Amino acid sequence: MARRFATRVTVSGTTFVRELDGILEYRLNTNGLQILLTQDPNAPVAGFMVTYHVGSRNEAIGYTGATHLLEHLMFKGSKNFNKENKKTIWEILETKGALVNATTWNDRTNYFEVMPKEHLGTAITLEADRMRHAHIREEDRQSEMTVVRNEFERGENNPMEALDKQIWALAYEAHPYHHSTIGWRSDIEKVPIARLKQFYDDFYWPDNATVSIVGGFDVKEALAMIVKEFGKHSKKKGDYLAMYTEEPNQEGERRATVARAGNTDLVGIAHKVPAAVHSDIPALIILALILADGKTSRLYRTLVDSALAIDVSTNCYQFHDPSLLITYATLASRTPHQKIEELVKDAYRAIALKGVSSTELNRAKRSIRTYIASLRDGPYAFLSALNEQIAAGDWTRFVTFPKKLVQVSAKDVQRVARQYLIDDQSTVGWFKALPQI
């Protein structure tokens, strides 16, 4: 995907919006479907993704996990592609060498296929069919509920996932980032099929979706196929249900302890950071890399090299709404939780007070350049990265954001550490492993 092509064409039923770094944006005139196309005529494969602008942030108590459960149900068949007529997605595409899957997260859901390019039309037809004609049936809910519940239980048995879930639930009192994408167990088990159908009808429409194609395809032919298949759907009648809940200001440190059977002790420290499109996010990402990216990072040298911890990571999440920067440390045997917490906070304070060196800054930027190169390493990598920017609210960040990362200065890093890594704005979590009986 190193070479970039931008063959702008005119196709009846679509409106060209703009081109940016080889990505063509169109709109479907009849229903507002957003279309993003990146062509490489020499590629033997094509990637196709439908990103719905709905995720767990659009759920509420009683139907948490609805987006994820619907993801499972939408593979159970649709009007023209189902097991009854022996035209399931698996029989039609996987048998032809396609990679077929879907993912759900806080701000989006996507369905995708990566396949030999001659089968792109089939993927377009199939995804258009289940956009508005998916089978949402009680018998499928019952069977898939047990699959999803097993996923939930695996997460509960993973110390890191269990602690992470607790930290997000404590950091957010009001905003739906409070609950994880998989939902609460009782909602998974008991949500009525009528509620899932309502959720589907609330959000799964062309004017709440983005279609992306990457790789080997003809732009004119692809647009014509999208017009033919997705143009069958109208835009939604009425407004979408807005997610208008804002998290109130935090007034003091919050703490949680998860104590359960296990063999791993953990410490997690989270701080609120702005939404993905905020101008401070590039500096916060560089800060996270300086803290815990690789064996020369500050926290690795402080915690792992000293044998106090066996692993450490820091991640700045980039979501549609204000999110979290979190550091996790996996403790070595007999290391006190309090010791790790103090050392992490000391590292934060040191950067806020004294800043970072040019060596640290340059090392972080080298890591960023490697990551940026990986974003175009094949159709799925490209689609996945583009999808996250769509979810954040601005797909053009896929092109513009890397430049902002390499422009971050040492003063920027010190400033955001001082502004956001404040104890009174933190959520601290400890996982204490109890003896297994």
What are these regions (language model features)?
Residues 149-155, 245-260, 366-375:
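Short, conserved secondary-structure transition motifs
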Residues 76-83, 131-139, 356:
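Short, polar/flexible loop-turn hinges at active-site or ligand-entry regions and domain interfaces
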Residues 104-112, 139-150:
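Short, glycine/charge-rich beta-strand/loop segments that flank catalytic centers
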Residues 1-88, 112-115, 125-127, 198-305, ...:
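His/Glu-rich zincin catalytic helix
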Residues 5-26, 169-209, 241-247, 284, ...:
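Histidine-acidic residue clusters that define the catalytic metal-binding segment
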Residues 121, 142, 189, 197, ...:
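Generic structural signal for individual residues within well-ordered alpha-helical segments
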Residues 38, 43-59, 65-69, 84-130, ...:
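M16 family metallopeptidases and their MPP-like homologs
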